[in-house]
Amino acid sequence: MKQRLFLMVSKAKSLCLVGAVLLSIQLGFAAGNEIVVTNNSELTTAINSAKPGDVIVMKDGEWKDVNLSFGSTATEEAPVTLKAQTAGQVILNGNSVLTLTKPNLKVDGLVFKGGAINKGAVINFNSDKCTVSNCAIIDYNPASFDTRYYWIFFSGNYNLLTHCFFKGKNNIEPVLGNAIDNSRHNTVTFCYFKDIPYAKQNGREIMRIWGPGKLGKPSDDGAFFTVEHNLFDHADGEGVEIVSLKSNHNFVRFNTVRASMGAFTNRQGHNNTFEGNFILGENRAGTLGMRVAGENLHVFNNYISNVSDNGLLLMAGEYMDKALTDGFKPGHGNKETLGAPRYCQVRNSVFENNTIIHSGGKGLQLGDAYRKHWPEMQMCLLPEGNTIKNNLIMNCAESNIDVVPVDADPATSFLQFAPNKFEGNVVSGGEVKGADKVSGILKKEVKGSFDKNGLYILKDAKEAKTVGANEYMTNTAECHPLQPNEVGPSWMK
């Protein structure tokens, strides 16, 4: 009887254990060992011997010259995690770097501070389905400005960078970038980019997203990169492009820019989306809104205010079918092959429900850089076939809307452009140039007030729902100006 009772109890315990394991797998957890390491040698051994589900814990303190090649074997159900003993208290310096070399790895709570490297990247996603969270890179700069390296680089797919902090990068190369090939479906979310000093040097974007479409026509392929819920605070870099898309099929949404020099830019690439971003210039010199080139873009529900320069610029494109003059100097090719345009024509895109207030230049311009650097560059393709509707543009210093006219130069007289469609746009307190007789632009004095976030709200409730960036009113949990306590690592709060 006792033996039978023992067997029944043992069987019950086994069933409970199996149930617990199954439940943990269903919830995304996996049982594993916790391995505490205190030096570089122990860290290397732990990484090489870790099993799926294990957690490697780096002891608090300073870690110098750590070549952290994280390549443990893991699975989606049982990732291997590398974490700080106390988030924010493991400080890597010297020439320390982190490279994730196998899939399904997680890194949490590390800080790279005060060190420097001479090439590559401080953190490199060199695999797929990895996550880096709750980490920081602070003042990780070389002695020479010309020493080139990224802080974050993606050369894999389906990776996630979330709730991290970046401050003080002052050398050449963007803070964050990705590989042209084999880098798709990566995401950067809830990160905080602060105090990136200005230096007049091309290639110092805060983010530069390469990939399919960089030099080509629209296609089904692209980088599929998502940049969302990030805060850029005095993040100047090169002072021209904050986020620079140079690939197809990307999403830039629900981000906040505060007093940062430069613009959100669709530099190259097509089928990209800019949604629900807040670009708040705070009247600081060098601030801009958005600048785009390319086809099949969707730019909507963005709020741009108090930038010192232009609000939303639709670029002129470069004509590449043939050389129109002997002075043409193609940028990507030669006079026989011509190659790809330096700027693509803005075509078949939708710009809707954006609010642009108090820009120091133009509010909305169609045809920015038209015939600029002629004849070396053939920037003579004006935007065509676009839909511009339900935008609110107010009190911009140079003009609220500026539609650049076609030049009478015989060299370009053969070009004809499909009309752009204007519908339901409201402008107030500023000029309209080149579109005075265009239907779909209503000039009127609007009434409204500024809410607690400093955002302009129209007094007319019906008009407020249809004109301007209205998503921040209807979906404030998802779309509102971000504050520092909403982004970055938890240990900073």
Locate predicted features.
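Surface beta-loop-beta hairpin patches that serve as ligand-binding interfaces in beta-rich domains
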Residues: G434-K493
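Bacterial N-terminal signal peptides
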Residues: L15-Q26
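Glycine- and acidic/polar-rich repeat regions and solenoidal domains
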Residues: N67, G94-T99, K113-C130, I137-A435, ...
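Bacterial N-terminal signal peptides that target proteins for export
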Residues: K2-L17
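Boundary at the C-terminal end of the N-terminal hydrophobic targeting segment
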Residues: A30-G32
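Right-handed parallel beta-helix/beta-spiral solenoid domain characteristic of secreted/periplasmic
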Residues: E34-S41, D60-N67, T73-A121, T131, ...
